[in-house]
Amino acid sequence: KAYGTTHDLTYVAGTQYVHSFGKLLFMPSDLTLGAEYNFDGLKDVILGYDRHFKQDVRIGSFFFQNEWKNKQWSFLLGGRLDKHNLMDHVIFSPRANLRFNPTENVNLRLTYAGGFRAPQAFDEDLHVGVVGGERLVTVLADNLKEERSNSFSLSADLYHKFGSVQTNLLIEGFYTDLNNVFALRQLDQPDAQGNTVQERYNAYGAKVLGLNIEAKAMFTRWFTLQAGITLQQSHYDEAIAWNDEVPEQKYKKMMRTPNTYGYFTATFTPVKRFTASLTGNYTGSMLIGHSAGSGVEEPVAVNTPKFMEVNMKLAYDFPVCKYLTLQVNGGIQNITNAYQNDFDKGWNRDSSYIYGPSLPRSYFVGVKVSY
């Protein structure tokens, strides 16, 4: 009954022109002009739930930019004009970029970019969930406006060699200001088919800011290590209610946005055809909504635990012939078995109450043919 059919037709056509100036005003530059047309026709039908959805999206765009650059400096100015058929006005998204290389091993960059998300249905809106035994569908609020963003970033990309060890360090600070930000809330009234309704609407503004650090080191030809961590804060300008059944539960913090997350990758190649890799992903605690059902008697927002997922993979390449290689691999996914342990169960579960790594500890083997 819950199954349906989705037809999605997408096509893109565009053109681009690039002209290089030996000198334009004060420095050599590259001028880029372009135009693009996007069409996406989406039709989703679930007969068992009497759900019929059709959406045609047409976007005509024109973009331009000029980048002045030499070995030490680059300065970019540009913008993009978009006309979306679900909006009655043209959107202008500016961008600017400043790069400075005081030495060959230091790259400093300051960036600004504007952007938007149109008031349209997205892939995740087509999903029909289950909350407390009732179907949950996502709808767009009346008079939904586009979400606008202004993003700034400042980064330093550093390279250095310590003896025989080659290293790279990237430090980036970022800040994004969002207006008419999209948010979701569960309404207390069902739709005409009796479905529980989750509405996408314009909340107040929001801000996302943080720091990203990534490092890479090549100790030898057979051992490399890469790691990164992101520290961020994601907050609405004013607290909003996530569920109309509990209007007193208001939060400024954005749901499903951890303040800390990171990764590491270690690769060993002791012999030519053998590779061993150890990878890990860290996800900090985040706030998520838990609707009433088999797990809780009334809706409540909870802070999830932290997760550290570690994976291992071993691979060996067998040359079959001059142009063909057979790889045999195997390993363990999620060695630490970092996995959610409080899933809802039964007919009245909250099907969206899922977080953390997608799989518990798992073992795998594989074969790969390359030529």
Give the residues covered by each predicted segment:
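Gram-negative outer-membrane beta-barrel transporters
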Residues: K69-S74, F174-D177, N195, E199-A292
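Face-selective signature of the C-terminal outer-membrane beta-barrel domain
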Residues: K1-D88, T167-Y175, G210-N212, M218, ...
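C-terminal beta-signal and adjacent terminal beta-strands/loops
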Residues: N179, Y282-S291, Y316-Y371
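Residues on the lipid-exposed face of transmembrane beta-strands in outer-membrane beta-barrel proteins
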Residues: A13-H19, F62-W68, A96-F100, L154-L158, ...
